[in-house]
């Protein structure tokens, strides 16, 4: 019974993490195409989403570890779980990189209001966001396929 509750909690937490990270590149693109008010909203909303993604990434890691230890530890789970844990750690690090990039751009944009600052980091945000989405695809596949 405890395992099932932990599993449901883990899936719910992971869904929030996925949802908060998947929309970031599109939000940035739409915010830059719109006017000043929308760009200001997009800048703060993107940072909020990155922070939320980081928090739920850590919670996913913790709930995943709880599931592993509920099963008896790492020697009792498959290689797919080991690989997924490593990829989750990489995604958390990527999120930290995204936050650092965006925080610098956010501060400069708030000081100057210059959209070109955001255009300059858009490519990096999309690139790191794309890496994160690729890792998501692999991790979700590993949760279904047993190795």
Which positions does each model-derived feature cover?
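Polytopic transmembrane helical bundles with strong interfacial aromatic enrichment
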Residues: 1-147
